[in-house]
UniProtKB/Swiss-Prot annotation:
Gene3D superfamilies: EF-hand. Ca(2+) 4 binds at residues 130, 132, 134, 136, 141. Belongs to the calmodulin family. This protein has four functional calcium-binding sites. Ca(2+) 1 binds at residues 21, 23, 25, 27, 32. The modification N-acetylalanine is found at residue 2. CDD domains: EFh (cd00051). Residues 8-43, 44-79, 81-116, 117-149 form the EF-hand domain. This is Calmodulin. Calmodulin mediates the control of a large number of enzymes, ion channels and other proteins by Ca(2+). Among the enzymes to be stimulated by the calmodulin-Ca(2+) complex are a number of protein kinases and phosphatases.
Amino acid sequence: MADNLTEEQIAEFKEAFSLFDKDGDGTITTKELGTVMRSLGQNPTEAELQDMINEVDADGNGTIDFPEFLSLMARKMKDTDTEEELVEAFKVFDRDGNGLISAAELRHVMTNLGEKLTDEEVDEMIREADVDGDGHINYEEFVRMMMAK
């Protein structure tokens, strides 16, 4: 299933994997998965984390390695984001609930994910998605950006 991914997608997933793999040992544990999910405003139980790992843990060793992660991501992409998932993702970024994602909100979420971005990088991300040029990302722009991936 991971065969359908482009080199660019694989490179993006490698970057995402390393955000999860906090200690850099090449595997994602339930603890590491929990850390990332909590930084995104989720609050999974230990059992839910274990279920998520088990769902993709092909060799049954209790952790996710990169090939297993790729397979999970390929599956998720095939199921493309539902409206509900997009709304939830938008809410993670739109911290004050005003229906717009500001540069500060974007920087906050990216920092929580361990991505230290310069102001220029954050501004560039906003500019890329900001179709109407108001300096913020609204829901329609967010959906367009997510679907373009």
